[in-house]
Amino acid sequence: MTEMTDSGMWLEVSSPFCGIASDDLTIKVDGNTVTVIDNGDAVTKKGFETPITEISPRVNGKAVPLEQAVTHIANLLRESKQPAIAGMATDLNGARSAMALADKSRATIDSMDSNASFRNTLVLQDTGWMVTTLTEVRNRVDLLLVVGSDIERDYPRFYERMVWNKESMFDQDIESRQVVYLGKTPSGDASTSPQGKKAQVIACDDAYLPEVMSVLRALVKGKTVQAKQVGGIAVTALATLAEQLKQAKYSVVVWAASSLNFEHAETTVQTLCEMVKDLNLTTRSNGLPLGGKEGSITANYVAAWQSGFPMRTNFNRGYPDYDPY
C-alpha cells in the first residue's frame, strides 16, 4: 500500500505510465517536481519527471482564468457542427468526463492510440480471443513467444517483473523458462535469464509476419507445409517452434499492437489468437496483448462500458454511432 515516510518519500507507488502495473516505485514530491528514486525505468521516469510548465489555461495563446477558458470552450462546442474530442491520455475519471462531454456536445470521440488499439479490438469483436493476466504470466509461464514486438523497449521492466521474478506461486523452476522472439530482434538483454540463458530469435521483416504466423499456425494444427522457407525463415525452424508450443504446459504468446505497424495487422493478431485456441485443445496457452500506456486501454474500456462501443464513436445523431474506419 502506498505510504509516505517522514523524509517525504512516497513508497510502493504504482506507475500509470509503464503498462505492466509496476507498483514498487519510490518517489519524492517537491512542489510541482516529482523524482523517481527507486525502481524507475525510461518510460516511468519520463512520465513522472517531465516538468510541469503550463499550469494556466490559455485562449489564443493568452493566459486567462479557468472560468473564462471553460466558457470559451463551451461556446465553441455549442457552435460547432462536427466537434471532435481526441487525445484521451487521461485516467478513468477523465475518460468518463470526456465521454459525457461527447454525448452532451454530440461530438466524435477518439483516442490518439486508436490505430494501434483497433488491431486488437477488431479481432476481439470478430472471433474473440483467449488472453491471460500479468499475474498468471508471472506464476505459470514456461514458454514465452514474443511476436513482432521489442517489448523491452516499450515495457522495460516486463522481464524483471513477469518472467525472471525470483519465485512463482507454484514453485516453478524460473530458470527453466524459455523465451522465443518471432519477427523483431530484442534491442537489449532483458530477455536473458539471470544465469545467462539467451532468448531464441527467429527474425523476419514485419512485412512477412502475416505469412510466417499463418505457416506457424498450420504447423501447430498438424498441417503439411510444402514450402521450405517463408519470409527468410526455414519451415523446419517454425516446425520446431510449433512443437515447443505443443509441448509447453503454459505457453504465452505476447505482442504489442503498437509495434505491428503494417497494413491489416489485425489479421496477424487474429491468426496468433486462433493459434492459441488450437493449442488449448491439448495443452494450456494464452495470449497477452501489451498496452495501456497513456490511457489507451482505459479510454476504450470506459467507452465500451458507457456506450457499448470502443473509441472512434460519434454522438452527432443523439446516440452512439461506431465507425472504426
Where are these regions (language model features)?
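Short amphipathic C-terminal alpha-helix that caps PH/PH-like domains
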Residues: 212-220, 271-272, 276
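Extended, charge-rich low-complexity interaction segments
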Residues: 135-159, 227-234, 239, 306-325
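Acidic catalytic cores of enzymes that act on phosphate-bearing nucleotides/polynucleotides
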Residues: 264-325
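Glycine-rich, charged/polar anion/phosphate-binding loops
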Residues: 11-13, 236-241, 275
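A charged, amphipathic alpha-helical module
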Residues: 221-266
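Alpha-helical structural motif
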Residues: 69, 208-212, 237, 241, ...
